[in-house]
């Protein structure tokens, strides 16, 4: 399908820009940002978006860990027809300046999390070596990636608290990747696996999404968020 991206002079396939070079369901494009308070060292903020054109899905999350308590938000939507924007309900990423600045937002939603943060690079992006792997003659990983350090300013709200971020105290990094990757599995019967920090939680953590904790007993609140 045609999108505004098809006006750009950067096609690399005889197809519209919403299509990729393979029909593999594991073809994925991701944005991941991690920001932390280097002064107080008591708060970590994570934000991510994934796009899966061959599954017709875009999803995202935001999470804040503050003094032993974690707050989570996750959402997903059908990708098409809105393939030319990074927005899943109240969660969005706005590019302000290529390879330099972007804005992360989480507007009004059923969780206690609210976010409006601008991230600015403090170094040039580092392009990692291409990651290509085969198994049994089949491509299982074929990924390009770059990462970059930066600083952040803006507002974080969670629970009953509001924190103002300034670039002197809030540093972080981002990871940008695209390509075919190994599938992530979340088989609840496999108790050998440990929960991921940004997707599973335990103890006093609060979550406002439907998710599954793996290998731990969890005291997690759940609520579906229709997008």
PLM features: residue spans?
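Structured soluble/peripheral alpha/beta segments that form catalytic or ligand/cofactor-binding pockets
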Residues: 1-227
């Amino acid at each position: 399908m045609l999108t505004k991206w098809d006006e750009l002079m950067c096609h690399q396939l005889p197809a519209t820009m919403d299509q990729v070079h393979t029909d593999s369901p594991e073809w994925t494009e991701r944005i991941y940002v991690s920001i932390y308070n280097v002064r107080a060292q008591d708060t970590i903020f994570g934000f991510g978006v994934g796009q899966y054109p061959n599954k017709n899905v875009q999803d995202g999350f935001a999470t804040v860990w503050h003094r032993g308590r974690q707050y989570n938000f996750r959402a997903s939507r059908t990708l098409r027809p809105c393939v030319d924007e990074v927005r899943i309900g109240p969660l969005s990423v706005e590019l302000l300046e290529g390879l330099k600045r972007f804005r992360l937002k989480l507007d009004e939603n059923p969780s206690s999390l609210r976010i409006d943060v601008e991230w600015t690079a403090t170094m040039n992006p580092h392009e990692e070596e291409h990651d290509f792997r085969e198994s049994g003659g089949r491509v299982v990983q074929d990924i390009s990636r770059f990462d970059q350090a930066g600083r952040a300013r803006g507002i974080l709200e969670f629970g009953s608290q509001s924190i103002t971020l300034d670039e002197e105290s809030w540093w972080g990094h981002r990871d940008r990747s695209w390509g075919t990757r190994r599938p992530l599995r979340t088989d609840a019967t496999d108790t050998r696996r440990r929960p991921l920090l940004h997707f599973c939680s335990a103890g006093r953590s609060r979550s406002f999404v439907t998710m599954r904790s793996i290998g731990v007993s969890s005291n997690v609140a759940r609520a579906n968020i229709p997008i």
